[in-house]
Amino acid sequence: MNIIKKTTSLTLVAVIAMSGCADLDVSNSNAPDQSRALAKPEDVESLIKSTFLTWWQGTHTTGGSFNPGVMADANTSSWGNYGMRELASEPRAAANNSPAWNYAYALEQPWYSWYGAISAAKDGLSAIASGQEGGKSFLADAEADTRAKIFADFIMGISNGMVAIYYDKGFLITEETDFSKEITTVPYDELMAGAIAILDQVISDCSANAAVSLPEDWLQIANLTLGDLGKIAHSFVARFKAGVARTRQERGAADWASIKSHASQGAPMAPAGDGDYWWTRTQYYTGVSASWGRSDYKMLGPADKSTGYTNWLGDGSDATIAGRKAYSMETDDARITGPLDADGLQTQGLYAKNEYRTRLIASRGLYHQTYYLFNRTRDYAVDQGLVGPMKDINQSELDLLQAEAALRANDGATAATLINKTRVSNGALTAAAAGDGVGSVSDAANALDGGSLWAKYKYEKIIEGCLQHPYTGYTDRRGWGDLVKGTPTMLAIPGKELEILLMENYTFGGQDAIGTPGTAGKIRNNGHRSRGFNIEWERVTPLNKADLH
């Protein structure tokens, strides 16, 4: 596939010193002086509004956006693209963090995109602060200054938060960060705490300025106010507090009362695609191509009434895994199949379709193969021609987070009511009830009538979240302790960045020392560079089947 890239250069003019590492000269001699580049108010406002596109593409458009789904076994793929085959094959191997790896970019792009958004937001905030000296407004008026500042803070919050979701550590960069002083990496939990503190302030500021309008092209959503942005910030806080956990124990220790509160005050987020720079690779490719949108049986199988899924799972041994073969399920879930046709074949379901064929290469692992296409996003990718809503936060995500809070509080009645919003309305399945029993977080996902509420909840959370926000299925399974053994529970700082920082390379995953850093490629050069963020926005072009490899 050919990708046309629009480039803008953003620079953090600073010197960052890290503990145990060389000082880094981060000035960019090829970039314009910051004070001149951001001297005009309209340039600053344009820079700030562009930050969400940078965040969006880092989350939804980079090739790496496919990897969380296949590591979570919601989607399945043995194609090499973006490193999917290596990250999803069994037995799981450690993530390849060598900068020389063919697909290193898939692990690097989210990191650089999110820090690029942070960089631009911080530059914009600094320019506004400088322009306000003497008590004057820098942009058109005080309201414009307030809107731009709150929006930039929102971007810094959700960008720091995504780094904490995916990587083991990072730099906590805020409006107050002073680059003349030493800055060190912080672990993911500390990074997330900082991100949430920013978003909590955004929520407060949005409440105080709720009536201020937000231009449509800032978030690609029409008729939005800062009051609405505050609700979206609530959604992110709920998602982040639940999703940051690396283990079952950490997720259990989360503040579920707070998660419930934020989720109940949250709102969905679905920017409008424009068929140009505003697009989502995961929702496009899987909606238009049967070779990309394959459903893993670990996602759909819990709804199988036959013994097929149990037989497919087997005893979980390497030999059993290698012998797994695609099969047709028997299910009442309307999301997976519609009524049988005249020939007794399953028809298109709400989200999926039984193609009665596999499309993945058998020699790369029969266990990857599936008959089921998960083409839930065909409305965006085909019917609407990439110009419809691109869903990131659904109401179902917010409802189901509240359901998990209820389960953890042993409130089966409330949990059942929330689970049924999708189980019954979308799946046309028998309603869950308090009498099913709360069960335990260790219960395997199970959509069948005999399953516990925890089992039914897990099934709903995975199928409803699949191919919406790319990371939620991965963070859910990670926090429930349900990832396949050896799956990386997070990524290391990208190997390319480790070279720059003169830090030893490391990685996560594999069959030994699960969840602890392993070894990877070593430093290859002196690690110095200009620390300018070169943001490339990718323009969508038609998918070419020949791109699969």
Residue ranges: model-predicted function:
Residues A211-D217, T430-A447, A513-I523:
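Surface-exposed intrinsically disordered loops and tails
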Residues M1-S19:
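Sec-dependent bacterial lipoprotein signal peptides
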Residues T414-L429:
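Active/binding-pocket-proximal capping segment
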Residues C21-S78, G451, G481, K485-H549:
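Membrane-proximal, proline-rich intrinsically disordered regions
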Residues P41-E42, M84-L398, R408-T414, G450-S452, ...:
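Structured, solvent-exposed acidic/aromatic patches
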